[in-house]
Every structure is written in C-alpha cells, then in structure tokens.
Amino acid sequence: MKNLIIIPSRLESSRLPNKPLADINGEPMIVHVFNRAREANIANVIVAAGNIEIKEVIENVGGEAILTKSDHASGSDRIYEALNLYDKDSSYDNVINLQGDLPNIQKDALTKIVSLLDSSNSDISTLGVKISSDQEILNPNIVKAYIKNLSENNIVDDFDRSFDLSKKDFLYHHIGIYGYKRNALESFIGLNQSKAEIDRKLEQMRAIENDMKIALGLIDELPISVDTQEDLEAARRIMVL
C-alpha cells in the first residue's frame, strides 16, 4: 500500500493566532510536526497550507506544501483539496490526516495509524490512550472514544465529550489523527454534516452516523497538543533541543 501523510495547517486560530508559526526552541511548530512525520519514514509527507507563509516555511526546510483555499470548514476538506492537487493520478491508497499542532508526535503513533488501515476491517483509523481518571471523563475538553469490547473488536461505537462514569472501563482519550482509505475519504467528504456532528462539534460523528467503521489503535502516551499559549509554553519546556 502507498501512503501519504498530509498535515493541514492555517494561521487563523481563535485561541492562538498564527499557531503554526509559533516558535518552539528555534523552529516553527509546523516544521517540528513535518520533520517528525518525515523522520518516521513510513509515507511521503506534504503540508496542506491555508496561507502562503506556511508554504514558505515548509519549502525552506526542503519540504513540499500545497497552497489550498484559506476558508475550508475543516481539516478534512483541506487535505482532500491538497490530495487532489498533489496526486492527480490517484497513486496513493491511504491518506493520513496529521494535525499540525502535535509537535512531538512519535513514530509509533504514525505506524499504528497505517497498520490499522492495512489489518482491520475499517474505513478510517485513529488513536487513543486508556483513560485513567474520573477527571478525564468529566472534562468536556477531552474527546472520548467508546468501545464496548476492545479485546474482540477495535471499532469505535461512539465519540463524545462527556460520558457517564459507569462507562469508564470502555473509554479512551481520543487523539485527533486519522488514517483514511482513499475511497473512504472521498465518501466522507461527499456526506452532509450529521446531527451528532453538529450537536457535539465532532466531525468524526459524520462517519459513525453513516455506518463507516473507525478502528482505534492504542498508544502508551499522549502527544503534546498545542491549542493555547499555556500549551505552547509547556511544549517549549518539554521539547528542549
């Protein structure tokens, strides 16, 4: 199977303006993500850039970036435009949507995403970490994946921001990286927004409500996710060069 990692990136962030260009120990955050993906050596890597400034910083480190429309509603829409511009002969089988705000993403996480697509009966793959505290379950800023029986079936039954504590043993802290079989991405983009997607503000519910199968792979450690200035300061402390 031929795999392509696409990192969607745009400057317009309500909580942290110009987030992709934020400096982490001498390099823009988007460069850290790009380098981690490239060093994993499991797929070709490009950036779907919503702004020329992002395209330029990636090209300055020898990478490839596709300039997309700036006003896409989601990262999935952005990577789909980039895919069609970059791969006009449809040579790639799988597409990995890697968020541009995960500056210390590990190779094993990306490897897991790809291997799930190849080994499971799923349309989409994603990642999670076992939830260890009630506080995580009750925190609406943490998206949870619910699987009734992971030992028999790693297909996600539901995603939500809050669940009853009685479901603790079946909940996983969701990490927003997605692998798509190419035809699944094409199908997903063609679907209308679903009710749960709108109500919960979770794009992946569009797939669930249209009977697309999302496989969850477990990893041991959450990557840093940078959404606020506090997250950025934490990343700078952790990622000391």
PLM feature spans:
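Conserved alpha/beta core of the MobA/IspD/sugar-nucleotide pyrophosphorylase nucleotidyltransferase superfamily
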Residues: 169-241
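N-terminal glycine-rich phosphate-binding loop and ensuing alpha1 helix
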Residues: 1-49
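Short, high-confidence coil segments that cap the C-terminus of an alpha-helix
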Residues: 42, 90-92, 120-123, 212
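Short, acidic/turn-prone active-site loops that include or flank metal/cofactor-
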Residues: 11, 69-75, 221-223
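A conserved hydrophobic position in a structured secondary element of the catalytic/binding core
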Residues: 49-50, 105, 180, 227
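Conserved core of the sugar-phosphate nucleotidyltransferase
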Residues: 105-194
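Short phosphate-binding loop-to-helix
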Residues: 46, 52-98, 102-112
